[in-house]
Amino acid sequence: HEMRKRVFTSKSFTNEHIIGAILFEKTMLSKVNGEFTADYLWNEKKIVSFLKVDKGLAEQNNGVKLMKPIPELETELKEAVEKHVFGTKMRSVIYEPNVEGIKAIVAQQFEFAKTICDAGLVPIIEPEVDINAPEKEKCEEILKAEIIEKLKTWNKEDKIMFKFTIPTIANHYLDLYDYECVVRIVALSGGYDIDKAVELLAKNNRMIASFSRALLQDLNANQSQEEF
């Protein structure tokens, strides 16, 4: 929390470049300069907060790792709403172009997303495709087709976001914005270093960075405020 607090209170952490921050539950329940984290970020920085709600990944099956069950989800969502959080984030991972596996990933993500929308929050649906997947492009093709099937019948009032691995074919996900419910599409760095991630991201219109690892990798507690 101290590390995150130092990031949040830094002069260079502003809404000129940052629109949202993903929090762990512990960070959401902690305070920054006397205010709960989400309130601090909104009141002082005009940056919205997202709560990480998944409980990690299940064992790999059908070329994918689904999320473990989230038994306390409704309680956590209620807490998040009380703490003025804007949305949530939940991650699952695709390793192979297995239609059954990818279908299951998308079904699970959208099922949780509905519960989250019903609670009044905006879910970030994150079906990561492993950057080392031998048939990454094929995985992305199946993933997008499955997502479109869901979006066709999705209530346009239930706003959602997507967090994707930067696609092999630039702008692969761009037309998901044709659906009114899609607020933002963000990219994960997925193990690329910052230079590579930025270079690939630049080829994708309307896709914004959600690169915690790439952005935080050079920080450490012993740096002066300026270096930090």
Segment roles from a protein language model:
Residues 60-65, 88-103, 130-136:
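Surface-exposed cleft-lining segments at the edges of enzyme active sites
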Residues 84-92, 121-128:
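Glycine-rich, often proline-containing surface loops adjacent to acidic residues and nearby aromatics
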Residues 117-168:
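Aromatic-anchored, glycine/proline-accented short structural segments
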Residues 75, 79, 104-118, 141-150, ...:
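Alpha-helical scaffolding segments of alpha/beta enzyme cores, especially the outer helices
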Residues 69, 98-105, 136-143, 228:
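Residue-level preference for long, well-ordered alpha-helices that form the structural scaffold
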